[in-house]
Amino acid sequence: MLHNISLYPGLTEGQLCRFFPEKEATAKTLLAHMLKEGRIFCSENGRYYANQEVQSGADKDLSRCVWVLLDFIDQVEYHTVGEFPAAILCFANGELYEIVPIPQGKETMICQLLRQPQKDAGKRIVVVDDAAQIELLDIPQAAGFCTVAEDGTVSNYKKEAELES
């Protein structure tokens, strides 16, 4: 639990407990115990941090990417924080995946970064603010696109193949 709080600062109780499928009640108890012992801290907005100094504000993009990770956590063998522009790297079903957030207005910049040759680049799960952004994106190795609602609900999309004339 502490490892996840350190990796992904600013997550909610619901997100942290979902890392432990079928043990969510135990995870909730552990979270309360760690909070009481002063090993973790909870901000006024209900987000958890490993120390008080880090509580400067939750990273909205990271939080949305964690919701995507949690959507298939039962298939994930390993996960960790990624290197920009990927927020999270994970192995699932023997494949490497990068979960990449693309905020509105940053499409061109991030697409250019992702088109640079990369050694061992995995499949990319692209998290967008709005499904309309998908048509603006040309991303190599994109396994799929998704949006995340405020409540953590993930909606998945595939980019339609372009028709040849």
Annotate the PLM regions:
Residues 2-5:
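Hydrophobic residues on short alpha-helical segments
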Residues 7-20:
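Short acidic, hydrophobic short linear motifs in intrinsically disordered regions
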Residues 12, 42-64:
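Short, cationic-aromatic polyanion-contact patches
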Residues 12, 26, 132-133:
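Short phosphate-engaging motifs
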Residues 19, 47-48, 96, 156:
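Intrinsically disordered, low-complexity N-terminal regions enriched in serine/proline/glycine
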Residues 20-36:
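Short amphipathic alpha-helical interaction segments
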Residues 63-165:
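Long, low-complexity, charge-rich intrinsically disordered regions
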